[in-house]
Amino acid sequence: MTVLTVVLGTPFLFGDHPVRWEAGSKLPTLVLDDAPESTAPADTTDVKASPSPTADPLKVAEPWKKGMPQWGVQLYWEEEKTKRSDAFIEKQAEKHAKYLIGLGANSVSVSFPFYIESRTSNVLSEGAKTPSPARVERVLKVFKDAGFRTTLRPIMDEGSLKQANGWRGNIEPDSRSAWFASYKKLVTPYLKVADEAKTNTFVIGTELNSLEGDVGWGPLVSSAEKSFSGEVSYDANWDNYVRGRISMPVNHLGVDAYFPVKVADTASVGTLAKGWNDWLDRKATGKLPNILIAESGIGAMKGAYHAPGDFYARRTVNEKVQANWYTAVCQVVQERQMQGVYWWSIHFDDDPNTAPDDKTASRLDFAGRPLTEKAIKTCFSSDYAGPGTDDSTS
């Protein structure tokens, strides 16, 4: 087991989606509808995510190998009130696999919720929306059989954290030892099925800022490695990447990256990339081969650059904003020789081939938005070879 110390930056999630923090703020703030309106003409090119020319539409054309970039998507899975059959979830996973192959993805991360009663609670549990270990295994096997690099990632749901500043990153259990014991009991069955499904990575924690560096992680990770033979990782929040150290006893550290860039909707891809690099440079300049963008995205709406992960706002749709952001992030990943990027997100029960209903859907949804799909396909089909396999940078 290797102990890595890295500073990582990302957004946190309210419920099952990311919500942004303004730099230096203790509370999440919504971006007001005050950004200059884009005057750029709308690009109406109809670009669908079509399968790559492979012999089998359910097979990744070039499966991931160590040293290659991870080009992926975060698939968020909440069980519906009316539980779907095992046959349904396998068919649904196949539908997503086919769509992701059409985008050129070689990786997928399956995220799912678990629950806490309050900010100070020591008890963690499954809920009605938590898929069972057996059902998770079925879905992971569909993606593995299709040739994807697979990740399993439990995320603490924040629905019970009603305080004004309540989020997973500032929980304070009354007894940390009891909290870790409860968490071990919760995740162990998922570690075992992840191992059975030959999953590449298990994310042992996501955005748990207040618990990072706690002595409880050592025994938990040691236990996890007895049940799971793949990589054990941790995904940290974006602001930590630039302002603090994270010491976690894991194989790898990822970052959920939603760096705010204070520019107009008409900003060029180069300007957006510079905004990202300015944030990254606060930690380190040059190549970042140890860093994986475990989660990134932005709303397809005006003013989104100011708060990329704002799930709740539904300002005027501007797909160009989202597409240009994706292009800029991909450019930075390649220029800094990072490990790859996973886009947030697609909901498991959604049809990725259907455009989102902008009256109700999150602006962060990208599936079914032609310009963004085109940007993803261009990113995933680039000639970027990846960070390489040097042990010092893998």
Residues of each region from the PLM?
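Aromatic-rich peripheral "rim/lid" segments of glycoside hydrolase catalytic domains that contact
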Residues: V6, P11, G15-P41, D46-G67, ...
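Surface-exposed, active-site-proximal loop segments in enzymatic domains
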Residues: K81-A87, F114-P133, E158-W179, K302-R314, ...
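Short, acidic/polar
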Residues: R84-L100, F180-V193, N237-I246, A323-Q331
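Aromatic- and glycine-enriched glycan-recognition loops and surfaces
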Residues: S85-G102, L124-D145
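Conserved, mostly hydrophobic/aromatic
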Residues: L100, V108, F202, L253, ...
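Substrate-binding cleft and catalytic face of glycoside hydrolase catalytic domains
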Residues: L103-N122, A134-L211, I346-D349
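Glycoside hydrolase catalytic-domain groove-lining segments
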Residues: S132-P133, R138, A146-R149, R153, ...
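Active-site neighborhood of glycoside hydrolase catalytic domains
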Residues: L186, T201, L211-D235
